[in-house]
């Protein structure tokens, strides 16, 4: 293409994404848009088309972002190229959202006509505003009996401050209002700015690994043009490659000769090493490089850490390969090798939150067929010693001796919880139980309130989300951001089985709730650990002090079965002999800890 053709084509490109809270109908709307623009033959259409991961379809949530190119003939008779970038809505996957928004000029904000604005709707809107996107409100599910579009329209204006007078009323399920949405995109979303003659700048917003073609980068071209055969350089790593193919997704991958300004597509350059392409990096030409990289999005720091160990220790290297491949298109995952006396070799992994941790775990088990044992999640603590040293602890077993500690600080988050009036009491109770400090309470309208609390991150990590959902019948929604570290009275609790410490069961707990936690865990382990041939004491200890103890009784054979009646001293002899044998066994026996026992430390639902 020459310069004029490129400029004309550029003016017809519209890049947009869809943002919404979980379950407000985002993936269904994406399906309808694909249908309306005839992206696929009718027989290829299936629900949640862009959710390509088996896990996403099963849980009904979007985890990874996805990009597709569509053509749409608008009412003005012109043909437009639309790039739809689908995003997840769950709080753990906000970074996926910020990545896709960085590649767009506009966003469709989907709000449920019955439920109105939720916490993550707001969080995603703020991300979109940070990226200066044109936001088009769409009120979805207007065919529901409980829908109240006028109230929601008012809410969008009051809470977010967007003009919602032209908000499209739609029902993705019934296919109502889809054309109006497409017309609004063409009309209101600006065309990409950028110059196809400038030095090349492409932003990598995702990537995946193909065993035959190497790493495939998902890119958005900001300036310049990239063709097959070009020598390109990754600006962060300085590595150079020759482009072997470029193309777009029309959900299926379709090869093209070149990608130019505004295009969203993929680039393969037989990149074999997973670490050479970092998400957020800028690709430029090797011969005529851009002066500076694009402003990437910030590197996310993991908040929650846990150990992952293969059940079969021979698969340690397979687990490393699996983590490397997942890390490639999940920039928020971090891992490093660690060893445990109880579990052998494995990895300490960092995640954004509990859902993120569960998903990664499930993906490893499914996609790579590796059975895992996971240890209790913990957060990063700052430990200050009496001799003036300070260091960071992300694994409870690295906690120093309590006598040497001056103070321990833990991360706190500011949690914004949106909840209907009737459940305010229940939510406050949960937050106080989690050592939360009340900050603020604001009414959104007559029926809904936003509560703001400061809560230690370690309390949210356990089962805060589950408790919140179950005590508010699923109506509460919540979003959190890290605000920094504060000192807390924290102690490390160790679990001893048969007088031996099991390092993988240690956890850090607040001194006030240590006794209760210890008691619950000891009782749980007593139920979960199978009986042995000898009796096994279970102890929860802080330093040298035993906080709670219980004993798993030994299994024993009835050695008196052969004695009919007979002399008591004969029976005594047999019983004493058995006792002696059990004692010997106890001194050499080791206790197998089942996976459920490690999970019990996580799920503290009994207290």
Swiss-Prot record:
Keywords of this entry: Cell membrane, GTP-binding, Hydrolase, Membrane, Nucleotide-binding, Protein biosynthesis
Family matches, as SUPFAM superfamilies: EF-G C-terminal domain-like, P-loop containing nucleoside triphosphate hydrolases
PANTHER family in alphabetical order: TRANSLATION FACTOR GUF1 HOMOLOG, CHLOROPLASTIC, TRANSLATION FACTOR GUF1-RELATED
Subcellular location as annotated: Cell membrane
GO MF term list: GTP binding; GTPase activity; ribosome binding; translation elongation factor activity
Family, per entry: Belongs to the TRAFAC class translation factor GTPase superfamily. Classic translation factor GTPase family. LepA subfamily.
A family per Pfam: GTP_EFTU
EC number(s) per entry: 3.6.5.n1
GO cellular component terms given for this protein: plasma membrane
Broad enzyme group: hydrolase
Sequence positions that bind GTP: 23-28, 140-143
Bilayer topology: Peripheral membrane protein
Domain tr-type G: 11-193
Protein name: Elongation factor 4
Gene3D superfamilies tied to this protein: 3.30.70.240, Elongation factor 4, C-terminal domain (3.30.70.2570), Elongation Factor G (Translational Gtpase), domain 3 (3.30.70.870), P-loop containing nucleotide triphosphate hydrolases (3.40.50.300), Translation factors (2.40.30.10)
Function recorded in the entry: Required for accurate and efficient protein synthesis under certain stress conditions. May act as a fidelity factor of the translation reaction, by catalyzing a one-codon backward translocation of tRNAs on improperly translocated ribosomes. Back-translocation proceeds from a post-translocation (POST) complex to a pre-translocation (PRE) complex, thus giving elongation factor G a second chance to translocate the tRNAs correctly. Binds to ribosomes in a GTP-dependent manner.
GO BP term (any one): positive regulation of translation
UniProt xrefs under CDD domains: EF4_II (cd03699), EF4_III (cd16260), LepA (cd01890), lepA_C (cd03709)
Gene (name only): lepA
Catalytic activity, as annotated: GTP + H2O = GDP + phosphate + H(+)
InterPro entries tied to this protein: EF-4, EFG_III/V, EFG_V-like, EFTu-like_2, G_TR_CS, LepA_C_sf, LepA_CTD, LepA_IV
Keyword DNA repair: no
């Amino acid at each position: 293409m020459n310069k004029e053709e490129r400029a004309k084509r550029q003016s017809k490109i519209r890049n947009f994404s869809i943002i919404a809270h979980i379950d407000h109908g985002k993936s269904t709307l994406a399906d309808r848009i694909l249908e309306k623009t005839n992206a696929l033959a009718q027989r290829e259409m299936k629900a949640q088309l862009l959710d390509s991961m088996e896990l996403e379809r099963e849980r009904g949530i979007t985890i990874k972002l996805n990009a597709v190119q569509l053509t749409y003939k608008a009412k003005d008779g012109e043909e437009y190229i639309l790039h739809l970038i689908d995003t997840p809505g769950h709080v753990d996957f906000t970074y996926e959202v910020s990545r896709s928004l960085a590649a767009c000029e506009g966003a469709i904000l989907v709000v449920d006509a019955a439920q109105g604005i939720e916490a993550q709707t707001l969080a995603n809107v703020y991300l979109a505003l940070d990226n200066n996107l044109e936001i088009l409100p769409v009120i979805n599910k207007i065919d529901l009996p409980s829908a109240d579009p006028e109230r929601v329209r008012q809410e969008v204006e009051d809470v977010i401050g967007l003009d919602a007078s032209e908000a499209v009323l739609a029902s993705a399920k019934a296919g109502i209002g889809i054309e109006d949405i497409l017309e609004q995109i063409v009309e209101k979303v600006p065309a990409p700015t950028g110059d196809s003659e400038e030095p090349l700048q492409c932003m990598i917003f995702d990537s995946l690994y193909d065993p035959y073609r190497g790493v495939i980068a998902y890119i958005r071209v900001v300036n310049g043009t990239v063709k097959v055969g070009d020598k390109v350089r990754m600006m962060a790593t300085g590595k150079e490659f020759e482009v072997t193919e470029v193309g777009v997704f029309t959900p299926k991958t379709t090869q093209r000769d070149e990608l130019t300004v505004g295009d969203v597509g993929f680039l393969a350059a037989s990149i074999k090493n997973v670490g050479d392409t970092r998400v957020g990096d800028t690709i430029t030409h090797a011969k005529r490089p851009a002066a500076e990289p694009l402003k990437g999005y910030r590197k996310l720091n993991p908040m929650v850490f846990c150990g992952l160990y293969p059940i079969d220790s021979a698969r340690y290297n397979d687990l490393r390969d699996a983590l490397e491949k997942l890390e490639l298109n999940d920039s928020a995952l971090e891992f490093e090798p660690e060893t445990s006396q109880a579990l052998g070799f494995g990895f300490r992994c960092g995640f954004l939150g509990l859902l993120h941790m569960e998903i990664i775990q499930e993906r490893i088990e499914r996609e790579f067929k590796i059975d895992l044992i996971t240890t209790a999640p913990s957060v990063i603590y700052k430990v200050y010693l009496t001799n003036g040293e300070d260091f960071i602890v992300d694994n409870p077993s690295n906690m120093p001796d309590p006598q040497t500690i001056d103070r321990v600080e833990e991360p706190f988050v500011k949690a914004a919880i949106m909840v209907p009036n009737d459940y305010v009491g229940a939510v406050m109770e949960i937050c106080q139980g989690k050592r939360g400090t009340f900050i603020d309470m604001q009414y959104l309208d007559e029926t809904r309130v936003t509560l703001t609390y400061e809560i230690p991150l370690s309390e949210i990590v356990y089962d805060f989300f589950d408790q919140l959902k179950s005590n508010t019948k699923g109506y509460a929604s919540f979003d959190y951001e890290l605000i920094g570290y504060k000192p807390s009275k924290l102690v490390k609790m160790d679990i001893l089985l048969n007088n031996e410490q099991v390092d993988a069961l240690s956890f850090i707990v607040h001194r006030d709730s240590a006794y209760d936690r210890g008691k619950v865990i000891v009782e749980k382990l007593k139920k979960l650990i199978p009986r042995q041939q000898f009796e096994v004491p279970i102890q929860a200890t802080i330093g040298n002090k035993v906080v709670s103890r219980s004993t798993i009784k030994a299994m024993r054979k009835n050695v008196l079965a052969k004695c009919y009646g007979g002399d008591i001293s004969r029976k005594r002899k047999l019983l004493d002999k058995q006792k002696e044998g059990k004692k010997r066994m106890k001194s050499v026996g080791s206790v197998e800890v089942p996976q459920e026992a490690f999970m019990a430390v996580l799920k503290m639902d009994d207290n």
